[in-house]
Structure formats: structure tokens, C-alpha cells
Amino acid sequence: MKYDSLADLVVQAEKQNVPLXXLIXKDQAE
């Protein structure tokens, strides 16, 4: 999962209803 900007990361987090952190972590794990 790659994002063009931090804003895109926030939007995806809101859509998936998961903590940013979790997404970031998940992103780093891949």
C-alpha cells in the first residue's frame, strides 16, 4: 500500500475506520 501524501493516508484510514497507526504499521510491514 502506497500513498501519494499523508492526506491520502488519513482518507484511507477514515474509510476503513482503523487507527492511523495501525495502517502505518501495516504499511511498513508489507
UniProtKB/Swiss-Prot annotation:
UniProt remark on cofactor binding: Binds 1 [4Fe-4S] cluster.
Catalyses: L-serine = pyruvate + NH4(+)
Give yes or no: UniProt keyword Metal-binding: yes
Q: Which UniProt keywords apply?
A: 4Fe-4S, Gluconeogenesis, Iron, Iron-sulfur, Lyase, Metal-binding
Tell me where on the tree of life, at the top rank, the source sits: Bacteria
Q: Which GO terms describe its biological process?
A: gluconeogenesis
Q: In which pathway does it act?
A: Carbohydrate biosynthesis; gluconeogenesis
Q: In the Enzyme Commission scheme, what number(s) does this protein have?
A: 4.3.1.17
According to the UniProt entry, its GO molecular function terms are: 4 iron, 4 sulfur cluster binding; L-serine ammonia-lyase activity; metal ion binding
- Cofactor(s) the protein needs: [4Fe-4S] cluster
Enzyme class at the top of the EC tree: lyase
Indicate the quaternary assembly.
Answer: Heterodimer of an alpha chain and a beta chain.
Of which family is this protein a member?
Answer: Belongs to the iron-sulfur dependent L-serine dehydratase family.
The protein's name? L-serine dehydratase, alpha chain
